[in-house]
């Protein structure tokens, strides 16, 4: 993971709260005490009194806890320094800010500092005549029952479920004791296991880690505290999920089994990003978890996936399961109730909406099929020559892929070479499957356009597909009865003109156009295929000294584009690859 950090003195909690309130109307900040509360929950606000919920803890776990202040969730939060409990005074300030005649429930994660400070604040509030109860969230299963018998389970992902479910119960009018029971029922039936590739970086502090570059840790806490064990080499997400679930269900060691789950139980699943995982990988992990649960006969009735309880930028994720069948009877009603809390980043869905996933299967639809014209176009092609040309193009793609990728890593996003390889593999498969009409000059090229469109992503895939589609149309418009150099020259010009309708790139803009435009122009000047191929190469080479005008490379610093002085400069990867392909095509067609 990257250990670069913004320069910081570490004092960022207060401005964070102000920024949160600025972007979420209805919240008020007590700056001095680093407390944020729901404005409508304050005494005298005019709202009907209800049981209020107060939580908090060390900062660095955002959106927990402050992000869960809102209608149908928490009413106030006291924020400590990064990974440090707030003081008793801060917590008492939060309690006073939302004091209610209906009473207040304090929700705290089960960590020693939090328990002490929130417990003391609760006792002070009781002494002052306030009606308060406290519940401690402990859902971690990585530390077994024997080892953790004295301190109990740590509070992890289930914390936000307690915030939301208890908060909704309070919003619906339950009394303090009932709300506390709802919260406790979620805690008692929750199990969480987390894993991370590394420690997180704390603002204002030097990054430190005891994990090697090929190690990961199961059970790492949300304060950089050590996990239960390290392992290597780095796993795939499916491998890691298998390992995590075996611990959560006590399959690896019964001592880690705190909650029983069966195929008959209604379950809530939460897959939590610890802060540094990409949304793409998190969504992948969510599907992997769901698939592996299904193999155990467990189909969650509600699934949450997102960033809820973090360890700053921790590169890991957690899996939380709640056995809803053993929790409060109305748990799904409370779960589904809308909330304004920004941290509950789950789109609102009612119970009926969730029914579509009741069998555990995501609704899918078949791919839209391309209906192709099966009638021969009337333009003959030599199947052997067509095949030879295509194979030569694929061979060139594979041969020059490493260099294309290297160039694109410097000047772009590094996918130019692999994108072309994907297209080449699809073309090879189509040749073997006989799904390209190699005897048809129009339909065969049109087939290629669809293959490229389906297999090549990114800008280059779109450009190749447009060009090939127009090339097929150009062959048809030529009026020729069989493919020839003349036909190809006419169609190439037709295709280039079509391509120019969809891109502003022209020769000299440092794109693949610098290879294809000279090729087409030279061919249409009647100078032959060899001269056209040479022009494509020369056009590609000229990009080594050009500044990018369009495309991703236009955002890259000029000094990056001129790095490879030993080669005469850095060429445009797309032009470099296309020139190689065109040269291979010409060579194959003439020998």
From Swiss-Prot:
Residue positions annotated to bind substrate are 58-61, 109, 114
List the molecular function annotations (GO) for this entry: ATP binding; glycerone kinase activity; triokinase activity
Residues forming the catalytic site: 223 (tele-hemiaminal-histidine intermediate)
Please tell me where ATP binds in this chain.
413-416, 459-460, 511-512, 572-574
Cite the EC number: 2.7.1.28, 2.7.1.29
Which keywords does this chain's UniProt record carry? Answer: ATP-binding, Glycerol metabolism, Kinase, Nucleotide-binding, Transferase
Q: What is the name listed in the Swiss-Prot or TrEMBL entry for this protein?
A: Dihydroxyacetone kinase 2
């Amino acid at each position: 993971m990257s250990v670069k950090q913004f320069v910081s003195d570490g004092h960022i909690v207060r401005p964070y709260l102000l920024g949160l309130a600025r972007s979420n109307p209805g919240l008020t900040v007590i700056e001095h005490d680093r407390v944020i509360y729901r404005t409508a929950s304050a005494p005298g606000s005019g709202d009907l009194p209800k049981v209020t919920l107060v939580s908090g803890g060390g900062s660095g776990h955002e959106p927990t806890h402050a992000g869960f202040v809102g209608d149908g969730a928490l009413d106030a939060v006291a924020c400590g320094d990064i990974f440090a409990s707030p003081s008793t005074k801060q917590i008492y300030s939060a309690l006073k800010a939302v004091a209610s005649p209906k009473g207040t429930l304090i929700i705290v994660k089960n960590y020693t500092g939090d328990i002490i400070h929130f417990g003391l604040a609760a006792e002070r509030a009781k002494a002052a005549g306030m009606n308060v109860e406290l519940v401690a969230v402990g859902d971690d299963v990585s530390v077994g029952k024997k080892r953790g018998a004295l301190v109990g389970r740590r509070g992890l992902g289930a914390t936000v479920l307690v915030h939301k479910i208890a908060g909704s119960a309070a919003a619906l009018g339950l009394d303090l004791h009932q709300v506390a029971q709802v919260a406790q029922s979620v805690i008692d039936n929750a199990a969480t296991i987390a894993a991370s590739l590394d420690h997180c970086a704390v603002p204002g502090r030097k990054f430190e880690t005891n994990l090697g570059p090929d190690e990961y840790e199961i059970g790492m806490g949300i304060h950089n505290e050590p996990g239960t064990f390290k392992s290597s080499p780095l796993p795939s997400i499916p491998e890691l999920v298998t390992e995590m679930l075996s611990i959560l269900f006590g399959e690896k060691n019964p001592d880690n089994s705190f909650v029983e789950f069966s195929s008959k139980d209604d379950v809530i699943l939460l897959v939590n990003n610890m802060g540094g995982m990409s949304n793409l990988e998190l969504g992948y992990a969510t599907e992997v978890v769901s698939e592996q649960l299904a193999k155990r006969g467990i189909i969650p009735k509600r699934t949450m996936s997102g960033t809820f309880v973090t360890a700053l930028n921790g590169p890991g994720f957690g899996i939380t399961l709640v056995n809803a069948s053993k929790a409060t009877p109305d748990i799904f009603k409370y779960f589904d109730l809308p909330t304004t809390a920004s941290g509950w980043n789950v789109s609102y869905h009612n119970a009926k909406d969730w029914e579509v996933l009741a069998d555990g299967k995501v609704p899918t639809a078949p791919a839209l099929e391309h209906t192709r014209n099966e009638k021969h176009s009337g333009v003959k092609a030599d199947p052997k020559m067509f095949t030879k040309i295509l194979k030569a193009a694929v061979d060139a793609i594979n041969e020059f892929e490493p260099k294309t990728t290297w160039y694109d890593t410097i000047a772009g996003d590094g996918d130019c070479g692999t994108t072309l390889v994907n297209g080449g593999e699809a073309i090879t498969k189509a040749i073997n499957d006989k799904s390209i009409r190699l005897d048809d000059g129009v339909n065969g090229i049109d087939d290629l356009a669809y293959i490229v469109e389906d297999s090549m992503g990114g800008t280059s895939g779109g450009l190749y597909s447009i060009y090939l589609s127009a090339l097929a149309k150009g062959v048809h418009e030529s009026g020729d009865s069989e493919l020839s150099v003349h036909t190809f020259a006419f169609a190439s010009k037709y295709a280039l003109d079509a391509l120019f309708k969809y891109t502003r790139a022209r020769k000299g803009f440092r794109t693949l156009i610098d290879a294809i435009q000279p090729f087409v122009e030279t061919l249409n000047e009647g100078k032959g295929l060899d001269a056209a191929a040479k022009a494509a190469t020369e056009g590609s080479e000229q990009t080594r000294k050009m500044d990018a005008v369009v495309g991703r490379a236009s955002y890259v610093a000029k000094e990056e584009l001129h790095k490879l002085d030993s080669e005469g400069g850095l060429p445009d990867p797309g032009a470099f690859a296309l020139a190689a392909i065109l040269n291979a095509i010409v060579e194959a067609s003439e020998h």
